[in-house]
């Protein structure tokens, strides 16, 4: 997966983070706790003063896709797309024989 691909999704999530968070009535403090960030870091990301990491993005996906309302909102906003969901599928690879 390319850096450009990651940055596109990170940007979409960053731009809509406060909307997604409030759509499921999470405080900044609670969301930060759920994803392992400080509240101050989360606030900086919401204010676009700090860039979100890929690991933070993936943690947010896990939180928001667990709730139907925020999952649908992520789909509508182009954050949780079919293309992205395909990346989450790990298929068994055939075992190599020596």
Regions found by a protein language model. Give the residues of each.
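DNA major-groove recognition helix of helix-turn-helix/homeodomain DNA-binding modules
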Residues: 55-76
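A short, Lys/Arg-rich alpha-helix, primarily the initiator
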Residues: 1-23
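Short, charged recognition helix plus adjacent turn
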Residues: 69-98
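Short basic helix-loop element that most often maps to the first helix and adjoining turn
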Residues: 15-31, 59, 92-97
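Short, conserved catalytic or interaction motifs in soluble domains
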Residues: 47
